[in-house]
């Protein structure tokens, strides 16, 4: 999103088509004279990406297709630029992925990436990743030695991510999400690699050892999945010390960070 917003500021010459699925929140972006948001039907994400997306790129006469989330169509007649955030899924066997503690949706996503990414890397004119560490890992894994093909560009940070000092704004966000006076903030999901289980165990141990009144605030986390993890760490009473915020608007995050 920040990439698109900043391109809108600096480029009024070239035409951009932003392809999105109908179920995505496209209101976070505003069209301009040379930036058009195109909603594409196409069913589940794999068929949308592999069939609907390349057809649309051809229909709108795109010179380049830039895919920003690890995967991309590999039947494509125009140059492709792909962003690979990491390749953790490539380092696990299909059996290990299936036996992992991830949700069915996450397992399917990792299998899809494992199938698609090698083809996409080969197809791409340019592969971008988010750090030099990942660049080295990707280069070694796929045998890419050409710096013209593989590059590291750090993630940008939105301008609204800064300490919030306004008492009115802090109070508004605190009330909106029922935040306690003292809390730790956990931003993650149910994927095992996010280490949620150990975070909960550490928080449980912290409370037992210190008697602290701190709460653990968890953003947009499923309560059923949380209860499963609490059973696994043998501390179901910990739920009393956890605040589940539900969905949080991106622009409210700085105020949550500022109060934790």
Task: Show where each model-derived region lies.
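Carbohydrate transferase catalytic cores enriched for Leloir-type hexosyltransferases
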Residues: 1-260
């Amino acid at each position: 999103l920040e990439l698109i917003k900043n391109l809108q500021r600096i480029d009024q010459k070239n035409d951009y088509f932003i392809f999105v699925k109908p179920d995505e929140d496209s209101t976070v972006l505003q069209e301009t004279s040379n930036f058009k948001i195109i909603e594409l039907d196409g069913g589940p994400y794999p068929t949308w990406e592999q069939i609907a997306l390349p057809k649309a790129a051809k229909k709108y006469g795109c010179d380049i297709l830039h895919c920003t989330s690890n995967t991309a169509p590999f039947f494509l007649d125009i140059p492709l630029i792909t962003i690979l955030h990491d390749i953790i899924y490539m380092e696990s066997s299909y059996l290990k992925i299936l036996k992992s503690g991830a949700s069915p949706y996450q397992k399917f996503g990792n299998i899809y990436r494992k199938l698609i990414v090698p083809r996409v890397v080969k197809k791409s004119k340019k592969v971008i990743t988010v750090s030099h560490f990942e660049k080295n890992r990707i280069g070694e894994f796929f045998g890419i030695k050409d710096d013209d093909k593989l590059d590291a560009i750090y993630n940008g940070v939105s301008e609204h991510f800064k300490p919030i000092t306004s008492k009115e704004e802090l109070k508004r966000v605190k009330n909106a999400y029922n935040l306690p006076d003292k809390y730790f903030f956990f931003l993650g999901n149910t994927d095992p690699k996010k280490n949620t289980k150990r975070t909960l165990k550490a928080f449980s141990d912290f409370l037992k050892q210190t008697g602290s009144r701190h709460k653990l605030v968890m953003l947009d986390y499923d309560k059923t999945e949380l209860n499963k993890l609490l059973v696994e760490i043998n501390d179901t009473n910990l739920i009393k010390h956890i605040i589940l915020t539900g969905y949080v608007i991106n622009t409210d995050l700085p105020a949550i960070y500022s109060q934790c």
